Curated annotation (Swiss-Prot):
GO terms for molecular function: ATP binding; ATP hydrolysis activity; ATP-dependent protein folding chaperone; protein dimerization activity; unfolded protein binding; zinc ion binding. Zn(2+) binds at residues 12, 15, 34, 37. The keyword Nucleotide-binding applies. Gene3D superfamilies: 1.10.8.60, ClpX chaperone, C4-type zinc finger domain, P-loop containing nucleotide triphosphate hydrolases. The lineage of its organism: Bacteria, Pseudomonadati, Pseudomonadota, Betaproteobacteria, Rhodocyclales. Pfam families: AAA_2, ClpB_D2-small, zf-C4_ClpX. Keywords: ATP-binding, Chaperone, Metal-binding, Nucleotide-binding, Zinc. It comes from Dechloromonas aromatica (strain RCB). CDD domains: RecA-like_ClpX. This is ATP-dependent Clp protease ATP-binding subunit ClpX.
Amino acid sequence: MSKGGQEKLLYCSFCGKSQHEVKKLIAGPSVFICDECISLCNDIIRDELPEEAAKAGRSDLPTPREISSILDQYVIGQEVAKRILSVAVYNHYKRLRHTAKNAGDVELSKSNILLIGPTGSGKTLLAQTLARLLNVPFVMADATTLTEAGYVGEDVENIIQKLLQKCDYDVEKAQQGIVYIDEIDKISRKSDNPSITRDVSGEGVQQALLKLIEGTTASIPPQGGRKHPNQDFVQVDTTNILFICGGAFAGLEKVIQSRSERGGIGFGAEVKSKDDGKAVGKILLDAEPEDLIKFGLIPELIGRLPVVATLQELEESALVQILTEPKNALVKQYQKLFSMEDVELEIRPTALSAIAKKALARKTGARGLRSILEHALLDTMYELPGMESVEKVVIDENTITGDTPPLLIYADQPKVSGSN
């Protein structure tokens, strides 16, 4: 208190606000700092930490074996694809480090990746897991929505715009990100002959993607929006952005078979028999650039995707593993949901096999597992929040096939869902 009986007014030493203008004023040796200035300092430190972490992360890059073992925690099977991806990604970020240190040395070219595999085999999950592991910006684009510049639809530069938005318009960070372009097979040209008419969503998009994938400086409108004359653009160099393209390439196996079955004629010709029993995934392993050209990709685009990884169709045992083993396994997710209602969920091995068989029959791969399990548990999840004394829900093979509802076990005695 001052001599006049009035309280001495204290001020923040940084912003000058009085103690009555802020929530809290913290005293130090002859200085004061308010809660607002502390919050501002925290924001500044928080912005600088990711940059330091990214630099430290790049200097301590995990080895291909370490990358593959981390992928194993999330993606079941696909060992060959994981090995190819691990080496390609490791070499890519090692190349960035080399370029930063040795600007005038041998220039290392970029190796973008093409993933070929049936739907639900893990193409997208592999790319997402890689980005999360390396702590780099990651964006997914759908090739089917892209058109040539000047036509209705998404411009290919929108992909880079999304990447910029992902890292709050930090250009340096965006220039070392990963872009995954899905459904790349859907922009194949309609025939293997060059088209005389404009193909704005097929071959035209492939042509537009060429420079972007190889490396160019893209002009991106700030904070999104359309391009306008006399507008300032954000310049993004795509040279160090890793592009991963993925597609199911349905029908490519027929192109490969027709090539491999071609033979000479006459008595000295080699006799080749059709191997109809060979799995699609096994046939795709024999894919050559000429097959992709025949399928409808232009040679220039294939040349810019030098690393090709083929994913196999998932078998029943692999689908069962996907349901239970990964960190974010589907069964674990539903068990967590049920635990929020204080109910235990048990899915028996026979039920897991039935789910896997159903997904195989539908030809939806791992992507179809959730819809099958969701359908089996729908009525139970609808009724359960309004029910009392339910301790456990048991799912068996008959529940998946639709013959019987899930078994509800109450605190006193077991009871079947839906019975009185």
